[in-house]
Amino acid sequence: MSDLKAQDSLRDFDVRTTFVFNDYPLRGSLVNLSQAWRDVLRPHPSWPRAAADTLGRFLAATVLMAGSLKFKGELKTQISGSGYLNMLSAVATSDGTCRGTLSVDDSMPIGPEGARDLGALVGRDTPIVIALLTDKAAPYLGVAPIEGGDAADALANYLARSEQVDSALSLAADDSRIAGLLLQKMPDAKSDEGDGAEIEAIKAMARSAMPEELLQTPAPALLRRLFGEYDLTALRQDPIVFRCSCGREKAAAGVVAMGLEGARELLDERGGIEVRCDNCLETYLFDEKDVDNLFRRPAR
């Protein structure tokens, strides 16, 4: 494996490793997040395991997909459904940060199939929405139905349908790590006619990665184990950390969105307005003076 022999220069965890196959038109990304995932989970000890693991797999996939795009901004994967897991949001930014949140409907028992079947967990008619948000252009939205039994199948189908990118994806999550491996055929790349079978074999190897392998094996060792017979070049490693995007300015915008009448009703009922971040649970307080300042019209 070409440049990957210099393993001492590659970090093992909390990074996204991007690599290419030198003899085939394939690029890949591998991510294994430990500290970042624990930071996502820390404010939410009551999240049910099946729901948290599903968020973890989608967050790993979102970090992988963000690494293959050329943009300045953030990529968001969102599900809003009618099942037990009725909301999921996973975000990765071009700056190497990630965050995620979820909500569940406790009135809908998960059932034995829910932990294994994504459709059973979120609702059969629920679509996946992928949003690319930048400060340079209007948001791009991609929508695809949930097909396949798990997050990896559903997102690979999304990439094939909405992005027309031939992909192989493996994902894993537990209460201390999340991990993922994404292989994609390079668009418009030329290859020999005989390469097709070999490319399919490589993709099958990627899909065969067991959850324990993805979660516990350092990046260089995992690439060696899966693709040791191929010539690979590691292009870069990007550190990934948890970082919430909340702040008082964003919270204030939420108060303004209520409208003056709605804000004053809350003030009358509760004596103040609390805006809580879904990701980190930071709470921002606004009193009557704050509300007056937010809705004060600029002098003419």
Q: What are the residue ranges of the model-derived segments?
A:
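Cys/His-clustered metal-coordination modules, chiefly Zn-binding fingers
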Residues: 206-300
